[in-house]
Amino acid sequence: MDFNREEIINRLLQLDRDMALIDTTEDIYSCVIVGGGALVLMNKIYRSTHDIDSIDASKEIIPLLEAYNINMNVRAYVLSFPDNYRERVQKLEIGSKKINFYTASLEDLVVSKLNSMRDKDIDDISNPLVYNDVNWEVLDLLIEDVCYGMLNDYDVNNLRRNYSEYKEKYKK
């Protein structure tokens, strides 16, 4: 199934309503969306996405995430984000009550896409809505942070090369 922006929001709101039925306490939970779904939610790309990925969520909502096919098996993403990515998350104002939904920052998403470099990732970050809005100074720092945490020189060199080519092509 493919999801456009409205369908992603509807799914997140249904998840929020279901969590409110399960947990009637005042507790508020969180979920950070990454990948193409995050870019769709941020209105940076207008394609549909095959899945909704979450890099981080309150443990209490994980069973519901699985029931709603929100993918938490994104270990590859974890290595593409600096440890402090949570400082830059953007809250989604979609009217949820029980779960605060966030997206990773645009810069963190670009780094993760540069690290992956699948065709759809390249297409996503080649969109003017992405490269014209990205903070290049922040992106420079995040690339170095991610490279510092990588385990081998091959991956470091690939990410640096991908970023250098991206920056040369799109930075104005």
Question: Predicted regions span which residues?
Answer:
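Compositionally biased terminal segments of proteins
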Residues: M1-K172
